[in-house]
Swiss-Prot record:
GO molecular function: magnesium ion binding; monooxygenase activity; ribulose-bisphosphate carboxylase activity
Residues noted as binding Mg(2+) in the record, renumbered to the chain: K217, D219, E220
GO biological process, one term: reductive pentose-phosphate cycle
Subunit and partners: Heterohexadecamer of 8 large chains and 8 small chains.
Gene: cbbL
UniProt record similarity statement: Belongs to the RuBisCO large chain family. Type I subfamily.
Entry protein name: Ribulose bisphosphate carboxylase large chain
């Protein structure tokens, strides 16, 4: 039995003339670069899908051969020559690795490279993120000649984007429905995330909305458990929404998580949410791309906002050398069609370098992404009219960080203070009041031309003199930070984790 490691391949490999069909398709093993997967003179077409991979070859594996192997294994190749290639337009369908660059400041003992690979558009099914990902992140991520592999960015051609519906609502229409402009939206996740009865759950929702939040939210793992059936949660939560709306005169909402074990159950829950008058439903990333696109189509048909919690993403986005960058996930989510997507906080408890996170937000909400290496964006990306996704900042944030959050993310974002609302020493409603007052004070100061980055703490202290709940929030959390080194910073800009 042959051991198909690089040294053995080198020992049994005989150079062939790839232009000669007799040699090119003779049985046996060829290097991927000689099979046509390395084409340094290739000029990508406007209709090509382009992927940028970070590759870490095994010792002794040439980086160009490694890039060619990634191109081959993510498109048409297998480990040996197959004569059935001659039955296809393989010269067209094979992916082309056309550029390899060393990663700046990578470890000399374990060098990394950026590999640019172009894919013919016909390789992918129209309007299917599942099919796109089956190729781009399929078997190739387990390929032995690579020590590690990470998908850093993609250029999606306009011709392919036009086959996707994108977000069912989008930022502009959502603001019109809510009649809320000129500031970020405010939310909170119900805590504790598990264990509350339906009635107590509804009370938390009411208190948060009554205190000034725009949304309350189910957490990722609250579905339908022994302590609270999903139908009870929906009923009590919507009772709270309706009561808070009547008392405040503002449009309010609660993200009802319809995630379930089957699509039939998810549709049933979504339909019930609609019957109760909810304007929004929620799903988790872990349901998969086909289910996400299915729920996006349902939301579009039913004029509902679709919120996505990115539960599970860090299992493959957090490590810098292997997996997928969240900027790619953000692109796929926009194509799949969600209206909200959790995209990081930079200053909270979860992983996120400030510049990287700003890059994720830009992917979600810009009409055209320009190359911005400092934020990890490698490609010029027009969005072909796809609606914009509202990015969500959630996880370990509090009122004392309001100036940082507003400076980092601007108005088109949702700031979700779960523990920073529910954990307020004077109660849930006081926590909501503190966050609303802090936000409005900071927006007012920004609009007056003040330097909120440097004056932010003073602005909050001034507002707290007239708002006891805000003073209590600042006294409780003012010094709470999560200032740890980021595991995933842009290669072309070193930045600290905390803004």
């Amino acid at each position: 039995m042959n051991d198909f490691s690089q040294p053995v391949i080198d020992s049994i490999h005989k150079p062939r003339d790839a232009a000669n069909p007799r040699e090119r398709y003779a049985a046996g093993v060829m290097k991927y670069r000689e099979m046509g997967y390395w084409q340094p003179d290739y000029a990508p077409k406007d209709t090509d899908v382009i992927a940028l991979f970070r590759i870490t070859p095994q010792p002794g594996v040439d980086p160009e051969e490694a890039a060619a192997a990634v191109a081959g294994e993510s498109s048409t190749a297998t480990w040996t020559v197959v004569w059935t290639d001659r039955l296809t337009a393989c010269d067209i369908y094979r992916a082309k690795a056309y550029r390899v660059d060393p990663v700046p400041a990578s470890n000399a003992a374990e060098p990394q490279y950026f590999a640019y690979i172009a894919y013919e558009l016909d390789l992918f099914e129209e309007g299917s993120v599942a099919n796109l990902t089956a190729s781009i992140i399929g078997n190739v991520f387990g390929f032995k000649p690579l020590k590690a592999l990470r998908l850093e960015d993609m250029r999606i051609p306009v011709a392919y984007l036009k086959t996707f519906q994108g977000p069912p609502t989008g930022i502009v229409v959502e603001r019109e429905r809510l009649d809320k402009y000129g500031r970020p939206l405010l939310g909170a996740t119900v805590k504790p995330k598990l264990g509350l009865s339906g009635k107590n759950y509804g009370r938390v929702v009411y208190e948060g909305l009554r205190g000034g939040l725009d949304f309350l939210k189910d957490d990722e793992n609250i579905n339908s458990q022994a302590f609270m059936h999903w139908r009870d949660r929906f009923l009590f939560a919507m009772e709270a929404v309706n009561r808070a709306q009547a008392e405040t005169g503002e449009v309010k909402g609660h993200y009802l998580n319809v995630t379930a074990g089957t699509m039939e159950d998810m549709y049933e829950r979504a339909e019930f949410a609609k019957e109760l008058g909810s304007c929004i439903v929620m799903i988790d990333l872990v349901i998969g791309w086909t289910a996400i696109q299915s729920m996006a189509r349902w939301a579009r048909r039913n004029d509902m906002i679709l919120h996505l919690h990115r539960a599970g993403h860090s299992t493959y986005t957090r490590q810098r050398n292997h997996g997928i960058s969240f900027r790619v996930i953000a692109k796929w989510l926009r194509m799949a069609g969600v209206d909200h997507a959790h995209a990081g906080t930079a200053v909270g408890k979860l992983e996120g370098d400030p510049l990287s996170v700003q890059g994720y937000y830009n992917v979600c909400r810009e009409s055209h992404n320009e190359v911005d290496l400092s934020r990890g964006i490698f490609f010029d990306q027009p969005w072909a009219g796809l609606r914009k996704v509202m990015p969500v900042a959630s996880g370990g944030i509090h009122a004392g960080q309001m100036h940082q959050l507003l400076d980092l993310f601007g108005d088109d974002a949702i700031l979700q203070f779960g523990g920073g609302t529910i954990g307020h020493p004077a109660g849930i409603q006081a926590g909501a009041v503190a966050n609303r007052v802090a936000l409005e004070a900071m927006v007012k100061a920004r609009n007056e031309g003040r330097d909120i980055v440097h004056e932010g703490p003073d602005i909050l202290e001034a507002a707290a003199r007239w708002c006891t709940p805000l003073k209590q929030a600042l006294d409780t959390w003012r010094d709470v930070t999560f200032n740890y080194a980021s595991t995933d910073t842009p290669d072309f800009a070193a930045t600290p984790t905390a803004a």
